[in-house]
Amino acid sequence: MVDMYASLRSNVGTLGQILGDTIRTDLDDTFLDKIEQIRHLAKSSRQGDSAARKEMLTLLSSLSDDELVPFAKAFNQFLNLANIAEQFHTISRNCDELVCVPDPVEQLLGRMLGGNIDQEKVLACLKTLDIDLVLTAHPTEISRRTLIQKYSAVIDSLTAQENTQLTEQEKKQHHLRLRQLIAQIWHTNEIRNERPTPVDEARWGLCTIEASLWQAVPDFLRQLNQQVEERTNTQLPTDIAPVRFSSWMGGDRDGNPFVTSAVTQEVLDRNRHTAARLYLKDVVLLVNELSMEGANEALLAYTNNSNEPYRDVLRTLRQKLRNTIDYLNGRLEGQHPDVDPSEIIWHESDLKDPLMMLYQSLCDRGMSLIANGLLLDMLRRIACFGIHMLRLDVRQDADRHADVIAELTRYLGMGDYAHWDETEKQSFLLRELSSKRPLIPANWQASPEVEEVVKTCRLVATQPARAMGSYVISMASQPSDVLAVLLLLKETGCPHPMRVVPLFETLDDLNNASACMSALFSIDWYRGYTKGIQEVMIGYSDSAKDAGVMAAAWAQYTAQEKLVAISQEANIKLTLFHGRGGTIGRGGGPAHEAILSQPPGSVDGRIRVTEQGEMIRFKFGLPKLAVQSLALYTSAVMEATLLPPPEPKPEWRQCMQQLAEESVLAYRAIVREEPDFVSYFRAATPEIELGKLPLGSRPAKRRVDGGIESLRAIPWIFAWSQNRLMLPAWLGAGEALKAASERGDLPLLQEMEKHWPFFKTRISMLEMVYAKAEPNLSKFYETSLVPKELHHLGVQLRERLAIGIEAVLELTQAESLMAHTPWNRESVELRNPYIDPLNFLQAELLARTRREEQSSKNVELALMLTIAGVAAGMRNTG
């Protein structure tokens, strides 16, 4: 039998061997031998060899302080290199067909156009697709930007070595380059010395666009155009942009005091600066390309019958882009440069219109072949990225807006808004929204917290509409939460209607979302403001932390169904914004399956989805990977729109409702009602130590005091993934499935898993999490770190994990987890022998740091490296 993953294992082996040689050169044979010995013992330990495990633990505990950092670094870097090999494998020529699916758009177009869907309907859907991927910094990408660039260079080197035409000398050169890169990686500090600022995070997002998406977007659209043309003999429009990009980096101030109005302004300027700089590169290339003379009458008239009409137009654009960069450099340096708007790129049309004139002229003069090269690529970049690169969302907590209005009403002697009921609040807000006089007095001295919210609204008011995305209200629950933001935007002079988006996060808020929106839709003023268009955000992270994944998933599903129904009834065009994380506990998982498992009618050609931290790198970090991801999103949204899944049967709904009710009880019985749970959580995981790691710009807690409810969803999940129990991603679900099976519902569950995409996705996600969970490792953390009087809770949790695994295997009728997804299983198994030693060492280091009043620098750094390494191995942080 052919080994499906031979080339993957070969690359992992090659990279691992080079890393080993690098370590030997830097340290010595003895140290490398010790690493290899521990790795082999970890493999044997995983196969049940208790003597090997004992020997490995003895070796780990005997590591000197000086050995801790290089040891943790070695295993950490091996896991990063394994990730690189896996990323490369999915875009490699040697990639196995089971891993690299054929182009999803090509498959879908074939299925639709070969079936009974009208060609015009398919093309109309494709041309109007509105997929907005929102880049966010949390859960923070653990790897430093400098290392990410080196990892990309490793993939470039592996790609170059695939060329079968290379001479021996060229092969040696590429291998030498690989060795140099891995040596650079080994000698680079992996852990940031300082926590990144929100501006650093925004720059990281811009780097992803420059390094990958800038090339991937036109590449993808060229492939898409070719597929459509071959099947329909139709060209796609020059300005087609099925996928666009927005960002929360520098705009998300929910619980992050470091995101101020000044920071948001700087990020907006940086976004625009990056766009101008990249467009300038394109124009410089076009000046060289478009040397031809023949032009249509419009272009000749515009250039006064120039001998080089195309170059004349491009030279003017080149100068305007240079002026734009100079202007933005001045702003970023804190100056307020005077500028003639006609001398810079001020509006998108300043850039697009001259280029469209060149495009039309080339086509008119029989030079379409030339027009459809770099010039079309640039036009499509403009359609996707605009002149602001990323549309920036603003996100703020609902309470912060209420605080502004309460402080204002008290100052004006109108009473205390904070003490009014919902009816009184709505009445006041609507009266003020309709009033022609200003509400905020010119001489009002607000408190610093309130002033910052007002400053943000003032900033939004000064920005071009296309620079901004949505104003997202976190923890929204009432119509007044939305109306309050609209009033603040009105009072600060916002000249254009901005999308104001409630984010429903908790179980109760999801269940009440349709009632809240229905109340808003019944307000004439509000309907006039929205002009029949509404966006609503569904929160995955906090609802799962509140109720467990099974109950949260059902609440998200039913909330969407109801929102779609009331929007259709009110003749409102609804866009659902999915706040998914990279992990299962935060709504993560394969995007294609996730979109196809949404309720019928909820996608309808448009969707917004957050793309989180480390998942941005895994999906979009390389141009070829990004093209695959763009194709997956496009095909999934088209399929969900034109071939939506069937409505779930009433008996499926009833069963799912019961599963949700039972799972939330099982989840909360532990997380909320077990008195020792918080103490166990803090002892058994590195939750406290995670707060010290210089990861994202945002504090780990919403409040300094408080328990699990005050902890952000990201560190909550990150901590449990470190000790390998993965608890937030499964607790409650297995117990509910077992109860359903015991009451005779197993055939019904199997029918649901086979025919209902929503339920199938849930079970698939559970399988993946169960496969990654390691009860023996979590028990080791418990033995090393948790007071004995709390061990009973660990026993209970591991029993629940076993119940869940058994329930899922019974449902799927499989002998092992992920039997139907061998690639995912291979991915997990490949990493385990390298993650396990890091886990054992982490538990040892946690015990040391908690025993000692002052740990050595080496112990602290090694602990951080184990945290980074486990995150790299688990392929997710929070």
UniProtKB/Swiss-Prot annotation:
Q: Name one GO cellular component term.
A: cytosol
Key word Disulfide bond present: no
Q: Which GO terms describe its molecular function?
A: magnesium ion binding; phosphoenolpyruvate carboxylase activity
Catalytic residues (UniProt) = 138, 545
**Which cofactor names does the annotation list?**
Mg(2+)
What processes in GO biological process is this protein linked to?
carbon fixation; oxaloacetate metabolic process; tricarboxylic acid cycle
Q: Which UniProt keywords apply?
A: Carbon dioxide fixation, Lyase, Magnesium
Q: Which domain of life is it from?
A: Bacteria
- Annotated membrane-spanning segments are none
Primary enzyme class: lyase
Which Pfam family would be a valid example here? Answer: PEPcase
Asked if DNA repair is a keyword of the record, the answer is: no
Question: What NCBIfam families does the annotation carry?
Answer: PRK00009.1
Please explain the role this protein plays, according to its UniProt record: Forms oxaloacetate, a four-carbon dicarboxylic acid source for the tricarboxylic acid cycle.
Cross-referenced PANTHER family: PHOSPHOENOLPYRUVATE CARBOXYLASE
Listed name of the protein? Phosphoenolpyruvate carboxylase
Source organism: Shewanella halifaxensis (strain HAW-EB4)
